[in-house]
UniProtKB/Swiss-Prot annotation:
InterPro entries, per the entry: CutC-like, CutC-like_dom_sf
Similarity field: Belongs to the CutC family.
Keywords linked to the UniProt accession: Cytoplasm
Organism of origin: Pectobacterium carotovorum subsp. carotovorum (strain PC1)
UniProt xrefs under HAMAP family: CutC (MF_00795)
Gene: cutC
An annotated Gene Ontology molecular function: copper ion binding
Chief location category: cytoplasm
Cited SUPFAM superfamilies: CutC-like (SSF110395)
GO cellular component: cytoplasm
Record protein name field: PF03932 family protein CutC
Taxonomic superkingdom: Bacteria
Intracellular or extracellular location(s): Cytoplasm
Amino acid sequence: MTKLEVCCYSVDCAITAAQSGADRIELCAGQREGGLTPSYGALRSAREKVAIPVHPIVRPRGGDFCYSTMELAAIKYDIEQIREMGFPGVVVGVLNEEGHIDLPKMREIMAVAQGMAVTFHRAFDMCLNPYVALEQLTDLGVSRILSSGQQQTAENGLRLLRELTQASRGPIIMAGSGVRLTNLHKFQQAGIRELHSSAGQWTSSPMRYRKIGVSMCSETELDEFSQYCVDGDVVAAMKRAVSPDREMQYVS
């Protein structure tokens, strides 16, 4: 059975995704930076309000995945807190200066995350050699790898995703980036059984008064009066599309 993980940037979105049939939530902050560690308040609210599994991302900043000693300490503290709050899994990833999995740092992270399902996020798509990385992450005990097949979209990276799925001795290969209702069948036909999607759209802020000429961000071209929200109808449609009955159509 294909599982659908929905990337959510708020607890409201996580509730919508769960009610619409998602199998799991990746909870993030910082949509415009590709996902950052959610706040304690968001984590606590998610634990109280979302019934399906929630895996928070732990990423202290945007940009690359090569972290300092202090950043690693922050990652470990966050994972410790997330584990103590009862979350079943966590999403994380660390590379070294040469583009390889940072094994010493990842070993420290895995020790702190003991007992949790660890997803190695799309830092995987920035690594030098995905086949070596797959073996290293297998040995580390990582549960799954979120990947676009080292391309801008998972559809473009489908060949590598298929090869990794066939080669994996352990971690589930979960396709993410540009996964949508219109291309789900391509991943199913490739034998990929976990899919990751934001399943949403940009929505306008409810603010009626909008101050002109003042921005809270140095990138003044960004529209601060819009936010990306999960669309429950899209989640429900995607879940129907990956249901067992539909899957039989792709293999028959």
